[in-house]
Amino acid sequence: MQSWSSAPVPIVPGREPELRLYDTADRQVRPVAPGNTATMYVCGITPYDATHLGHAATYLAFDLIHRLWLDLGHEVRYVQNVTDVDDPLFERADRDGVDWRDLAAQEVALFREDMAALRVLSPHDYVGATEAVAEIIELVEKLLASGAAYVLDGEHPDVYYRSDATLQFGYESGYDRDTMLGLFEQRGGDPGRPGKNDALDALLWRAARPGEPSWPSPFGPGRPGWHIECAAIALSRVGSGLDVQGGGSDLIFPHHEFTAAHAECVTGEQRFARHYVHAGMIGWDGHKMSKSRGNLVLVSGLRAEGVNPAAVRLGLLAGHYRADRFWSQQVLDEAVGRLQRWRAATTLPAGPDAAAVVARVRQYLADDLNTPKAIAALDGWATDALDYGGHDEVAPRLVASTIDALLGVDL
């Protein structure tokens, strides 16, 4: 699947400190120590609706990681999937009277436009689940052969994963069983399905039903479950020893827990990823942003209104990536004003020395992507430049390059 074009990333003199990120499994901030090539897998969209600000905030967080790794001199192997075969997609296509494949193609195209407008660096591999069916089938076969999966008896011989197949299951989320069961039911699971060995067992392969797409397999025609898609794509594109698995905090359980468990079953490793990183949720004017409330703020909608995507990006980066936070007109207005001040300061013929502020920006971003502190440091430099001027002719360009390279904001 085609991704999108990335804008060039400036090279900033100097070197960033070691990157440290909060790991959901360990419940602490600790160093990320990739080799020459840093690897990251981030869960992509289910393409049945347009990109909203919650999506955007998540992908901006991992874009920062991508940029900081580049600043450290790493090659980056970044993989993102598209869940282009799933119930919400089929339901929306049926509601709108369109082919599900056409709907998916339309929404993926819009997502690409939104990501390019927000200057999110494109993934190395952008893979639809429908493009990875062979790898998914191979992984399900391995799980069946090892006893980690079983075929359900009955009219629909679906394949399920045994939630007790690994001793470490549950380490990523740290949730107790009751919490798991509640979230499993809320987020696409089927704890009440008759015939399963355990209520928490997760669907690997849904046997063919009338009116649904299906693919042939050794265990019968059908289509992939949700979690196995990401496990198969990550293992086939990156392999074991992933540096970062990421997504929104609503994916911690069941999606990321099961994705990791599926992969760990076949690799024998205790951890699918060295770091599990999750971004907070975005609300609107004090309320949770959701389709049911009808209060989604769409990136494409803001662009259509003439809002500068750089201001959208800067507004989302004003909050810490792990925090649940709210978008509002005030947030946007502050971002627009900040963008104007930064542009005015970085187009001066000279300004205050920039070495110290560049070092602080790197330091703050390396400390679990502390964008509020990094932005505050840049605000301070811009205020000094506009109020008092300076004699360093290189400083304005250096600050502009730093903002571009590390924060992804083009002034």
From Swiss-Prot:
Q: Which GO terms describe its molecular function?
A: ATP binding; cysteine-glucosaminylinositol ligase activity; cysteine-tRNA ligase activity; zinc ion binding
What GO CC terms are in its UniProt record? cytosol
**Which positions are annotated as binding L-cysteinyl-5'-AMP?**
C43, G44, I45, T46, T58, N81, V82, T83, W226, G248, S249, D250, I282
Q: What gene is it encoded by?
A: mshC
Q: Which keywords does the record carry?
A: ATP-binding, Ligase, Metal-binding, Nucleotide-binding, Zinc
For whether the record's keyword set contains Glycoprotein, the answer is no
Manner of cofactor binding, per the entry note: Binds 1 zinc ion per subunit.
The chemistry this enzyme catalyses reads: 1D-myo-inositol 2-amino-2-deoxy-alpha-D-glucopyranoside + L-cysteine + ATP = 1D-myo-inositol 2-(L-cysteinylamino)-2-deoxy-alpha-D-glucopyranoside + AMP + diphosphate + H(+)
UniProt xrefs under Pfam families:
tRNA-synt_1e (PF01406)
Q: What is this protein called?
A: L-cysteine:1D-myo-inositol 2-amino-2-deoxy-alpha-D-glucopyranoside ligase
NCBIfam families assigned to the protein according to its UniProt record, in alphabetical order: mycothiol_MshC
The UniProt annotation places Zn(2+) binding at: C43, C230, H255
| Family membership | Belongs to the class-I aminoacyl-tRNA synthetase family. MshC subfamily.
Q: What's a BP term from Gene Ontology annotated to this protein?
A: mycothiol biosynthetic process
| Listed InterPro entries | Cys-tRNA/MSH_ligase, Mycothiol_ligase_MshC, Rossmann-like_a/b/a_fold, tRNA-synt_1_cat_dom, tRNAsynth_Ia_anticodon-bd
Entry superkingdom? Bacteria
